[in-house]
């Protein structure tokens, strides 16, 4: 088959390694463990390359390498899928235990604004020989047929989206074992596109029914009362526009229903093959609640629990404040219902988090701003009114969670270490230098703002991110800690605490050290088990 409009050389296998070609620059890319990046091994591989392909060089990287080649006559675009081939090398053998994995696939550009950049992001759909969907656990991610190659082109650090998702996945509550994650996982890779080096990307999962554990659309013979049961169970909606009233979880006065996959500022992501007015009812019903709660005198947790997963409801805005999301006031956000037959509990899942940590989605430097200047959740109901009137219940629930997060996932040291770790992966693999050489020479305009210049020294960007976070951390302390409930009504149970716990320290029921017992629950302190109820 002719790929990319020209005859492409096959991968080159040298012993245990498979090398992928950059035919434009006459280089072979090989993925090795960091421990194997020795001069002697590289010399051996280089000699073998010269023997097979005189005049070609070798690029050694500790990142997996993906080669995408458009099939002859096909061209990847924004709205039309193109047939492609995918070749993946991974020294950790995370894809079905293989160092080298290959598949056919379909691809298109993803992201409305991001698709205007020369360095595109791609949506991939793996296929078999019959062009049907093919599931595979690429790089050990959730087994499926849809994946995202995130270009991170508007992020001058090439890490914000992945950094934020990693932090979110640490703190986000899971509904049960059927839910793989309430956010995507991903890994850095280096991409070869049609035989030419295309830069560093992040291969990540797509938010979908399988990741969130939503129940499938299914036709039953009858409901419990003998009537015909609705086939709709799990629902997944994506807010695709940030300029629509519905993106603030509110209904227009004269709203109409939809029987398609689009309704005002939202897309029906599942079950997208069965659009109808009924498919939109869970979201409309939720908006009825958020609008009513927006005008209530105080937040009612009991009422809230019938419409949102309670922890998730509070985790989302706090996460938004901690990372200062600039484009996630429900825009770039998913709302899902696992099984609307059983309950009407909604879950919130974030998406596209690159406008964070001191920059917005255009890489404009907004590092002077922290969570104190403006509310990054915009006018979303009921968050804005709860925050602006400093609703005591709302602020206390955020304070309780922030007090827990600030000594663990969102501790300054932990966040800064994560930033340094991601930077180390990019720099030590050589990918950052190649990324700068590939993309900083171009005058890339983004949403009318540009050019975007990458710093050769990545620490310039990471230092800005870390200094911004330290300021934001202090701001969040000042904003939320005054609303911490005072410990009260602590009951002591005569029982021995587990061994190995230090006196004068507080622990939760799982044995994890915490700052203090702030919410109702079981705690361990000074060798005793305590119950707090307020």
Spans of features found by a protein language model:
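C-terminal tail/sorting-segment detector
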Residues: 522-534
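Middle-to-C-terminal accessory/interaction subdomains
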Residues: 113, 117, 264, 268-330, ...
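Regulatory N- and C-terminal appendages and interdomain linkers associated
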Residues: 2-108, 413, 417-488
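Short, well-structured beta-strand/strand-turn elements
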Residues: 171-188, 325
């Amino acid at each position: 088959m002719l790929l990319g409009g020209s005859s492409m050389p096959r991968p080159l296998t040298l012993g245990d390694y498979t090398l992928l070609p950059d035919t434009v620059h006459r280089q072979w890319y090989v993925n090795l463990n960091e421990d194997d990046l020795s001069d002697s091994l590289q010399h051996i591989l280089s000699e073998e390359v010269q023997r097979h392909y005189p005049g070609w060089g070798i690029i050694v990287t500790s990142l997996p390498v993906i080669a995408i080649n458009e099939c002859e006559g096909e061209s990847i675009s924004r709205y039309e899928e193109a047939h492609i081939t995918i070749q993946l090398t991974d020294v950790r053998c995370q894809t079905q235990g293989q160092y080298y994995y290959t598949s056919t696939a379909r691809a298109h550009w993803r992201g409305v604004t991001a698709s205007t950049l020369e360095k595109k992001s791609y949506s991939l759909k793996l296929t078999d020989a019959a062009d049907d969907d093919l599931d595979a656990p690429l790089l050990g991610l959730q087994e499926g047929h849809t994946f995202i190659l995130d270009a991170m082109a508007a992020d001058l650090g090439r890490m914000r989206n992945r950094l934020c998702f990693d932090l979110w996945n640490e703190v986000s509550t899971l509904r049960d074992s059927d839910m793989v994650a309430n956010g995507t996982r991903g890994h850095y890779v280096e991409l070869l596109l049609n035989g030419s080096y295309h830069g560093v990307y992040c291969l990540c999962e797509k938010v979908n029914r399988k990741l969130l554990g939503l129940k499938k659309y299914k036709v039953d013979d009858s409901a419990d009362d003998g009537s015909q049961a609705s086939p709709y169970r799990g629902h997944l909606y994506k807010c695709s526009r940030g300029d629509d009233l519905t993106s603030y979880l509110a209904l227009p006065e004269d709203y109409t229903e939809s029987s398609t996959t689009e309704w005002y500022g939202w897309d029906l992501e599942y079950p997208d093959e069965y659009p109808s007015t009924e498919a939109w009812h869970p979201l409309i019903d939720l908006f009825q609640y958020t609008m009513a709660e927006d005008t209530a005198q105080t937040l009612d947790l009991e009422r809230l629990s019938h419409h949102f997963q309670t922890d998730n409801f509070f985790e989302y805005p706090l996460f938004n404040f901690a990372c200062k999301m600039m484009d996630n006031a429900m825009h770039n956000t998913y709302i899902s219902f696992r099984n609307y037959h059983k309950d009407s509990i909604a879950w919130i899942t974030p998406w596209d988090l690159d406008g964070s940590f001191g920059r917005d989605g255009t890489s404009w430097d907004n590092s002077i701003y922290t969570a104190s200047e403006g509310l990054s959740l915009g006018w979303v109901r009921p968050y804005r009114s709860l925050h602006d009137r400093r609703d005591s219940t709302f602020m206390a629930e955020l304070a309780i969670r922030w007090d827990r997060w600030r000594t663990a996932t969102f501790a300054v040291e932990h966040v800064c270490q994560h930033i340094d770790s991601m930077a180390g992966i990019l720099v030590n693999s050589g990918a950052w230098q190649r990324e700068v050489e590939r993309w900083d020479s171009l005058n890339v305009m983004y949403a009318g703002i540009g050019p975007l210049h990458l710093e050769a020294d990545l620490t310039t960007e990471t230092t800005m991110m870390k200094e911004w976070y330290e300021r934001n951390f202090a701001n969040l302390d000042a904003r939320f800690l005054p609303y911490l409930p005072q410990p009260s009504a602590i009951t002591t149970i005569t029982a021995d605490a587990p061994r190995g716990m230090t006196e004068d320290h507080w622990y939760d029921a799982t044995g994890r050290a915490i700052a203090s017992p702030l919410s109702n629950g079981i705690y361990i302190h000074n060798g005793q088990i305590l119950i707090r109820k307020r």
